[in-house]
């Protein structure tokens, strides 16, 4: 009889221990959203705008590597709030500004707060980020270079054709 009473309490004790351990494990693993919120805070600190920006929406977390030190690609939008930077208020406590600026952000974050690695660029929709402008300029240069090489090859081909035509005897 004593054994039967101890089994449920043993089961309860193990279940509570397991839940406690799982809770500790989850509380130490930072979330994707938390990493993005840290990136938004970093954006607010670096931004030259006078008002704070707040997370508007966030694309779902990409599946893959579970290592919190591995950078994860992110894509989200922020919107200007009514709070000025000088007020030193948390963006989450600020209302969105009517007709506030919305910026599309993309880049990479690490989930580990100790590493706190962000590579984020935010721009208004329709505006190209600086690094994309560099790539488009490079593409233009490559296209022009390819056209010049094509023209040179065409001239070389014509010279070769002319050379062989001169070797063929002409009928008199």
Curated annotation (Swiss-Prot):
Proteolytically cleaved by cathepsin CTSG. PROSITE patterns: CATHELICIDINS_1, CATHELICIDINS_2. Its main location: secreted. Residues 28-134 are annotated as: Cathelin-like domain (CLD). GO terms for biological process: amyloid fibril formation; antibacterial humoral response; antimicrobial humoral immune response mediated by antimicrobial peptide; cellular response to interleukin-1; cellular response to interleukin-6; cellular response to lipopolysaccharide; cellular response to peptidoglycan; cellular response to tumor necrosis factor. Residues 1-27 form the signal peptide. It comes from the Eukaryota. Keywords: Antibiotic, Antimicrobial, Disulfide bond, Immunity, Innate immunity, Secreted, Signal. This is Cathelicidin antimicrobial peptide. It comes from Mus musculus (Mouse).
